[in-house]
């Protein structure tokens, strides 16, 4: 999106923005039920403000403090609850339409996972607790109206105590890892998926569509990792499980064009302890040493053949 210019004999690209703008928004229904979101917002603007770099002329700059204030102003204007994706698009669209010099905007949001609490079997009308994984999104909007929308998950921690192994890998003089067909498989999934919508006018009009889609994608990823409740599904490697999770996402959601997954292999090492008198702890698939330093790092992406990504 950034345009390269020749300035005083040099190639030059620039952008500016505001990061880590924290905003919370509460909506209240007539029935007394409250809804809350907490977002960390980042903004990047692409604009014709070269003079601010070359000389003392700031007349074309949108101040980053103005960007911060705009986040709160637009949150105030949102009278109905909306998804992080819709708010990101709303903000980006504002910057490219309101400011003549701004040619494009990137807005990214990380949503803090506040979840409604259950008290005595009933959803509390205004009580929330902090969950674990985070909902992320990034909207890229250009003055022409073109759009790229990406959503994601950070920190989806999953573990299964069996139905995992790793065998027949390359062996050489540096290899010490034994083959195993029985191990704990644990990871913290970072997922990104990009929607196929290419303009603001092609977006679904259903309220909270992207919030629902986030929950549905998360369920597909987890269900594919674990398999059926009785018996599960065998994982011959993190690589294979990652691929199946990405493929299941594309197969389930036709409006998703691209999926990227990062899945570190968080190790649970068998514990065997002995002394001269014999075993103190004999490992029988029961006692482990959990460690994530160092850990394996596995990542891959999958996209449809017609995708431009």
UniProtKB/Swiss-Prot annotation:
* Active site annotation, chain numbering: 18, 64, 267
Listed EC numbers: 1.7.3.3
Q: Does the keyword Transport apply?
A: no
**Name of one Pfam family that matches:** Uricase
**Entry's Gene Ontology cellular component terms:** peroxisome
Q: In which pathway does it act?
A: Purine metabolism; urate degradation; (S)-allantoin from urate: step 1/3
Q: Where does urate bind?
A: 64-65, 166, 183, 238-239, 265
Listed under catalytic activity are: urate + O2 + H2O = 5-hydroxyisourate + H2O2
A GO BP annotation: urate catabolic process
Could you tell me where this protein is found in the cell?
Peroxisome
Keyword Oxidoreductase among record annotations: yes
Q: Which UniProt keywords apply?
A: Oxidoreductase, Peroxisome, Purine metabolism
Give this protein's Gene Ontology molecular function annotations: urate oxidase activity
Against Gene3D superfamilies, the record matches this protein to: Urate Oxidase
* Oligomer and partners: Homotetramer.
What exactly does this protein do? Answer: Catalyzes the oxidation of uric acid to 5-hydroxyisourate, which is further processed to form (S)-allantoin.
Q: So what family is this one in?
A: Belongs to the uricase family.
Know the name of this protein?
Uricase-2 isozyme 2
Organism in which the protein naturally occurs: Glycine max (Soybean)
